[in-house]
């Protein structure tokens, strides 16, 4: 440790730390100090910027210095440049404080502390001050509890603050989620991990990148308690650990993983190592697993060392990569996975091959790289997901009742906070006072949630007081709802006051969306325009405005690509890119667009292809910043039309639900990200423009049991401009629907209108009906209800009753008027379960060996026959119901 002072002294004195200096210092300690010291030294060499490491120029205690070294040795490049040493030192101070003051602090080993308590970052969220704030709020609440009970208590605290609500892919910071009072699963789990770490409890976010049995993904939390890792649903407290709504779903998972900060040497299988994190496989914590060994060979049967091997699961109508490994010197890789079907796709130097693998049956797999960019063809693939397994921990009725009471109280705490947001009338009065569009102002303030004061202050201070006043509402109007919930006053002021005026030849909507707009992609918004107005001369600004292609040339020549130190592809602030002149490819594109907009040039990242582009005289031009070009449209593109022969209840297949299109670039499929509402009729019926190259069309029909009838079609788009036709084929299930169980149609439920018991038969009449048992305020039920609403028209056309049973009349009254339960099909009838009799009957008659996971949905008839059953987390429920209904007729 003493000899490290040589290095820190050099940094503190501002001595240039070049490679020769590093070699001189490192040679002194390599034989006696740790990997951490070596990695820290290598990091200094890689960055070659004294300013970044200025935090080490001030005196620190040894434990603080070691923790700071650990963070700086492994943090991704954007975290190194975008946040100050003072910020990290405060986080280190509070981490050590929690370790000293919390009763379990001394029992946490160094490995678990360094990797699962100390790191600030959880996922790809914006970093904030939550470590200090959460510690001060939680310490008295948990310090007299056992470590096990403290984990449960912290989750109850999180539930007081946040409940589930889906949103876009950008991850809110923990404090932003608290301010908003809701978040998606990735944000809820980020919040819980941050809160647990704040009180010194090791925690990590666990992801299934994609489920195997339904179209979605999920994130939750594992907490280390007295030597063992336990899991829990974030902001969804249960009476005990290792119990969550996703127990059954996780038992059907193909892959669950987590990324551990730094060089981790724990007992779990390592999926990959980068300079910043170690990715580990935790699938065996949740599901039965088997090993698969894949050998990659060329056409002649010789091993292909270094080949990339991707393990892909069917989800959202594409084969999504769960894990990517590199073949060893014998051309082999090994991976532990859940026992279901998976696609193995291997490539090397432009050649590729693929094979479906049934994990648990196929232990040794051979993939031949026998395809090139000229290959075309198609095949049908039947996908079978893992079977449900596992048991829930036992919970007494008293524990359940006590937990339900706590949840109700926590809902009231959160709802009391939400009630402080301005109501519609106060929003309307505010808009009238400013003499602005009432409907637009009300929409903006509603969307901003707990950030409403920021928007009100911004509008009040600027409307009528600046020449840019006319652009205030357009500026707010182009922001996403999530942006409105966490945007700062500084950002709004910067982009209003420092964006160049709209040119006369530029339409207002182009100016608002692609010049004024602070949002480029998925980055955290910053007030960067004033910075670039200052650092770029008027002469340079005028030149680039006239020659935007030259700004693209400057970026290519002057901003180097670092493909090593940002493996998570976090977004670096544009100002930091300017200062360092080095970043990853994605951040360079954001930088190009951000500075272009600061210059008054309309620019964007194409939402379909990911290509950085600038606008000139009504045409979008590529900036040429992409290392791998997956552009789907360009000058001279081919108009590709797809014919489709409709199947029953599927007149217009949906992108991401029934089909996707990828461009195969250097042997690897790259998904084309068309809008979420794209369909066959809007995209392929009349044709989509595709640049020349090789493409992969995937279609799939999700079955009621989670299986998939999929088809892969690889085709070539020629170089010469012309039209071509392909076929969009949706496979159909063969045979009639089978009876899978029984449900007595005379079973009773509580009728809410008459306040008496009523039979299913008396409500549904003769024939088929849908019955659902729901659990309001849970993510699986919220998804199911949204799916029913999405299929409202077709379900109403069917005309049969849909009976939704709530756990109690109180639960019905508290939830039926909420937004998520609005606009349901007119055929829906709501009631109350009576003593769990219906669910117990279903479990018995369907021979289920574990407790039912809500929500439960069945299609049954008046002859007591059940032909469809689903439980727990299911995406696409409405589509599944309609698929079965179509077969019934």
Each language-model region and where it sits:
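Short, solvent-exposed loop/turn segments at conserved positions within beta-propeller repeat blades
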Residues: 213-215, 654, 851-852
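Cysteine-centered nucleophilic/redox motifs
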Residues: 154, 181-206, 221, 551, ...
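N-terminal accessory/pre-domain segments preceding catalytic cores
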Residues: 22-151, 155, 198, 225-230, ...
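Structural micro-motif
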Residues: 218-220, 825-828, 843-858
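Short, conserved helix/loop micro-motifs enriched in His/Cys and acidic residues
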Residues: 127-139, 158-190, 528-531, 556-584
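Beta-rich nucleic-acid/ligand-interaction surfaces
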Residues: 175-180, 209-224, 573-580, 610-619
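Bacterial Sec-dependent N-terminal signal peptides
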Residues: 1-24
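Surface-exposed loop and adjacent secondary-structure segments within mature catalytic domains
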Residues: 237-240
């Amino acid at each position: 440790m003493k000899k490290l002072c040589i290095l820190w002294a050099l940094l503190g004195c501002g001595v240039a730390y070049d490679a020769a200096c590093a070699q001189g210092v490192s040679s002194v300690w390599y034989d006696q100090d740790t990997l951490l010291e070596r990695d820290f030294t290598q990091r200094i060499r890689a960055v070659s910027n004294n300013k970044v490491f200025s935090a080490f120029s001030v005196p620190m205690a040894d434990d603080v210095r070691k923790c700071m070294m650990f963070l700086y040795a492994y943090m991704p490049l954007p975290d190194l440049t975008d946040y100050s040493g003072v910020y990290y030192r405060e986080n280190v101070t509070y981490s050590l404080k929690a370790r000293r003051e919390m009763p379990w602090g001394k029992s946490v080993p160094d490995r678990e502390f360094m990797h699962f308590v100390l790191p600030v970052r959880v996922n790809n969220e914006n970093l904030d001050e939550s470590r200090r704030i959460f510690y001060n709020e939680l310490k008295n609440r948990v310090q007299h509890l056992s470590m096990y009970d403290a984990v449960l208590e912290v989750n109850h605290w999180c539930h007081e603050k946040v409940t589930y609500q889906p949103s876009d892919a950008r991850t809110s910071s923990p404090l932003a989620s608290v301010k908003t009072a809701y978040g998606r699963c990735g944000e809820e789990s980020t919040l819980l991990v941050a809160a647990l770490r704040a009180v010194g409890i090791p925690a990590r976010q666990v992801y299934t990148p994609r489920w195997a049995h339904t179209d979605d993904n999920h994130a939750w939390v594992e907490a280390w308690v007295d030597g063992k890792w336990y899991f829990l649903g974030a902001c969804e407290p249960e009476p005990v650990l290792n119990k969550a709504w996703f127990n059954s779903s996780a038992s059907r998972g193909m892959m669950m993983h987590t990324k551990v900060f730094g060089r981790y040497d724990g007992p779990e299988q390592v999926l990959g190592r980068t300079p910043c994190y170690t990715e580990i496989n935790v699938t065996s914590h949740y599901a039965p697993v088997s090993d698969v060994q894949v050998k990659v060979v060329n056409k002649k049967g010789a091993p292909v060392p270094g080949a990339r091997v991707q393990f892909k699961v069917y989800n959202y109508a594409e084969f999504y990569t769960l894990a990517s490994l590199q073949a060893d010197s014998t051309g082999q890789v090994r991976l532990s996975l859940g026992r279901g079907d998976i696609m193995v796709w291997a490539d090397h130097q432009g050649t590729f091959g693929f094979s479906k693998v049934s994990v648990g049956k196929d232990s040794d797999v051979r993939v031949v790289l026998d395809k090139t960019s000229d290959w075309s063809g198609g095949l049908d693939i039947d996908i079978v997901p893992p079977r449900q397994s596992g048991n829930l921990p036992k919970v007494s009725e008293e524990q359940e009742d006590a937990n339900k009471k706590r949840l109700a109280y926590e809902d009231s705490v959160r709802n009391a906070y939400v009630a402080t947001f301005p109501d519609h009338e106060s929003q309307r009065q505010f808009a009238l006072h400013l003499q602005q569009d009432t409907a637009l102002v009300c929409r903006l303030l509603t969307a901003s949630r707990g950030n409403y004061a920021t928007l009100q202050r911004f509008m009040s201070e600027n409307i009528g007081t600046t020449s840019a006043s006319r652009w205030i509402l357009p500026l707010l109007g182009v922001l996403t709802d999530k942006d409105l919930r966490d945007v700062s006053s500084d950002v709004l002021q910067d982009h209003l006051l420092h964006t160049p005026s709209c040119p006369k030849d530029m339409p207002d909507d182009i100016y608002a969306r692609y010049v004024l707009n602070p949002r480029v992609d998925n980055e955290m918004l910053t007030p960067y325009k004033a910075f670039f107005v200052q650092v770029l001369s008027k002469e340079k600004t005028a030149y680039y405005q006239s020659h935007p292609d030259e700004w693209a040339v400057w970026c290519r020549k002057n901003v180097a690509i670092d493909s090593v130190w940002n493996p998570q592809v976090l977004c670096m602030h544009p100002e930091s890119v300017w200062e360092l002149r080095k970043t990853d490819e994605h951040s360079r594109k954001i930088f190009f667009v951000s500075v272009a907009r600061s210059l008054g040039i309309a620019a964007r990242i194409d939402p379909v292809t990911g290509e950085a582009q600038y606008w000139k005289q009504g045409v979008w031009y590529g900036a040429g910043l992409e290392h791998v070009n997956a552009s789907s449209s360009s000058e001279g593109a081919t108009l590709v039309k797809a014919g489709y022969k409709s199947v029953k209840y599927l007149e217009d297949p949906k992108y991401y639900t029934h089909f996707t299109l990828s461009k195969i670039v250097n042997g690897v499929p790259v998904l084309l990200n068309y809008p979420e509402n794209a369909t066959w009729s809007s995209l392929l019926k009349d044709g989509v423009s595709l640049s020349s190259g090789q493409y992969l069309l995937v279609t799939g029909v999700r079955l009621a049991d989670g299986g998939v009838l999929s088809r892969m079609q690889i085709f070539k788009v020629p170089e010469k401009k012309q039209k071509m036709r392909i076929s969009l084929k949706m496979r159909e299930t063969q045979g009639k629907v089978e009876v899978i169980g029984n449900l007595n149609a005379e079973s009773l439920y509580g009728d809410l209108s008459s306040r008496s018991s009523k039979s299913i038969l008396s409500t549904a009449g003769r024939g088929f009906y849908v019955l659902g048992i729901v659990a309001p305020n849970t993510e699986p039920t919220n998804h199911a209800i949204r799916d029913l609403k999405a299929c409202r028209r077709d379900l109403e056309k069917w005309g049969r009753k849909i009976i939704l049973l709530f756990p109690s009349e109180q639960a019905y009254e508290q939830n039926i008027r909420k937004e998520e339960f609005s606009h349901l099909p007119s055929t829906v009838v709501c009631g109350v379960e009576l003593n769990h009799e219906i669910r117990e009957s279903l479990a018995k008659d369907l021979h289920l060996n574990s407790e039912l996971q809500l929500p439960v949905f069945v299609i049954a008839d008046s002859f007591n026959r059940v032909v469809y059953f689903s439980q727990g987390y299911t995406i696409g429920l409405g589509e599944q119901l309609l698929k079965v209904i179509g077969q019934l007729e």
